[in-house]
From Swiss-Prot:
The lineage of its organism: Bacteria, Pseudomonadati, Pseudomonadota, Gammaproteobacteria, Enterobacterales. The gene is yfgJ. Coiled coil: none annotated. Gene3D superfamilies: YfgJ-like (2.10.290.10). One of its GO terms (biological process) is bacterial-type flagellum-dependent swarming motility. This is Uncharacterized protein YfgJ.
Amino acid sequence: MELHCPQCQHVLDQDNGHARCRSCGEFIEMKALCPDCHQPLQVLKACGAVDYFCQHGHGLISKKRVEFVLA
């Protein structure tokens, strides 16, 4: 899913919870949501890896399944 810059409406480059607009240079925080219940996910970082955990009963969520939205 492509997210667009709220300032200039260009497509954002996404990287692990952050987004950057190539056009205007804006840096934007993103929020990770569970694809099943759409609740915020807990971000677990260890040894260079980033994992996502749903505290509402859906457990560990693959990075490929996480829904990112602008925070």
